[in-house]
Regions:
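Conserved N-terminal catalytic core of the sugar/cofactor nucleotidyltransferase
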Residues: 1-75, 79-85, 91, 300, ...
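Residue-level signal for inorganic ion chemistry
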Residues: 2, 58, 77, 119, ...
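Short coil/turn connectors at secondary-structure junctions
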Residues: 15-16, 38-39, 66-69, 98-102, ...
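Short beta-strand segments
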Residues: 21, 72-75, 104-108, 140, ...
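Short histidine/acidic/glycine/proline-rich micro-motifs that form metal-
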Residues: 78-80, 109, 234
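Conserved core of the sugar-phosphate nucleotidyltransferase
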Residues: 83-206, 226, 299
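Left-handed beta-helix
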Residues: 168-321
Length: 321
C-alpha cells in the first residue's frame, strides 16, 4: 500500500518533495519498498506520539526546503480507487491553503459507518477548479449507528479522511497558538536540525513529547478550517473488515490471504502469515493469524481492534503492537 500511495502522488509532486514519516524500526522497510525515494526524505520517529507531533516534525523538515511551501498530509493505509480525482482535489485544496486556511478532504459517505469520524459543513466559501469549498462547522468523533444514519441522511456530513492540506507556515502558527508546549519543543528541535547535535537533541526532546491527535490538537479548535467534499473511491484500510470490500472473494464470499481450508464458512476474512487455518461453521467473521498473536471477531466488530490495541498498551504488552 505504501508503493501504491507513492504512485498516486508522484504524478502530482516531484519525488524530492515527498517525505515519509515512519517508526525508526521501519526505515529500512520503506527504503526497500520505495528505493527511488531520497534517503534523507525518510523521517524516523523514535517513538510514536500521535499524528500531531508527527506532522509538526515533518513541517520542520519542509520549512527548511521552503518556508512558504504547501504541505499535504496523506496516509499510506488508504485505498483510493480514483487517483486522478484525488490529485485534482489536492490541487484545488492547495489553492485554498495559500490563503492561510487549514483544508481537509471530506469523503462523501455511502453508508452510515461508525468507524469513521465525521465533518459537518457550514457555509459555502468558494468553488475552486470545479470543487466546492465549505467552512467546517464541526468535527464529530466516531458516532453510534443511529447518529451515523442521521449524519448520512442529512447530506451535510462527510467522513473525516485524515488528509490535510495547508501551508507549512500556517500549521506551525497553529501549533504555536493551540499547542504551545509542543511548539516550544519543535523550536528546540529545529535549532538542531542539520547540526552534529541533531540526533542527541531529537532523542532528548522527543522523549518528553505528549501524545496528541491532529484532530483534537488543532483541527477541532482552529478558527479557519475548510473542507472540500470528494468522491474518490476511498476506504481507510485501518480495519480488517475493510479488506472484505477491497479484495476478491471466493464463491462463498470469503477473502483468503494465506492457507485456509473451510467447511460451511461464508463471508469471512481469513488471513494467515505462516500456517494453515481451518474453520467450520463460521459466517461473517474475521480470523487473523500472525506469528505472535491470533485475532478472531465478528466482522462488524473489527473496528474494536483499536480498543484492544489501547488495552495492550495499558498492559505494557508493546511487543504485540
Amino acid at each position: 500500500m505504501l508503493q501504491e500511495a507513492w504512485e498516486r502522488i508522484t504524478p502530482f509532486v516531484p519525488s524530492e518533495k515527498i517525505f515519509v514519516v515512519t517508526s525508526e524500526a521501519y526505515i529500512d522497510v520503506v527504503r526497500q519498498q520505495i528505493p527511488q525515494m531520497p534517503a534523507a526524505n525518510i523521517i524516523g520517529e523514535l517513538e510514536g506520539h500521535g499524528k500531531a507531533p508527527c506532522i509538526g516534525l515533518s513541517a520542520l523538515h519542509l520549512r527548511q526546503l521552503d518556508p512558504e511551501a504547501v504541505m499535504a498530509v496523506l496516509t499510506a493505509d488508504h485505498y483510493i480507487e480514483r487517483a486522478d480525482e484525488l490529485r485534482r482535489a489536492l490541487g484545488a485544496a492547495a489553492q485554498v491553503a495559500t490563503e492561510g486556511r487549514l483544508v481537509t478532504l471530506g469523503i462523501q459517505p455511502n453508508r452510515p459507518a461508525t468507524g469513521y469520524g465525521y465533518i459537518e459543513r457550514g457555509e459555502k466559501l468558494a468553488q475552486v477548479s470545479g470543487h466546492d469549498v465549505y467552512r467546517v462547522k464541526k468535527f464529530t468523533e466516531k458516532p453510534d449507528l443511529a447518529t451515523a444514519q442521521a449524519f448520512t441522511e442529512s447530506g451535510r456530513y462527510y467522513w473525516n479522511s485524515g488528509m490535510f492540506i495547508w501551508k507549512v507556515s500556517t500549521i506551525l502558527h497553529e501549533f504555536e497558538k493551540l499547542m504551545p508546549q509542543f511548539y516550544a519543543q519543535l523550536i528546540e528541535i529545529d535549532a538542531a536540525l542539520g547540526t552534529a547535535e541533531e540526533q542527541v537533541v531529537l532523542e532528548r526532546v522527543w522523549a518528553k513529547v505528549e501524545n496528541e491527535t491532529i484532530d483534537y490538537g488543532i483541527m477541532e479548535r482552529a478558527e479557519d478550517v475548510a473542507v472540500i467534499p470528494v468522491d474518490i473511491g476511498w476506504s481507510d484500510v485501518g480495519s480488517w473488515a475493510t479488506l472484505l470490500e477491497l479484495l476478491p472473494a471466493d464463491a462463498e464470499g470469503n477473502v483468503i490471504v494465506g492457507q485456509h481450508i473451510g467447511l460451511d464458512t461464508k463471508g469471512c476474512l481469513v488471513h494467515s502469515s505462516r500456517r494453515l487455518v481451518t474453520t467450520i461453521g463460521l459466517e461473517d467473521m474475521v480470523v487473523v493469524d500472525t506469528e505472535d498473536a491470533l485475532l478472531v471477531c465478528p466482522k462488524e466488530r473489527a473496528q474494536d481492534v483499536k480498543k484492544l490495541v489501547d488495552m495492550l498498551k495499558e498492559m505494557g504488552k508493546d511487543e504485540y503492537l
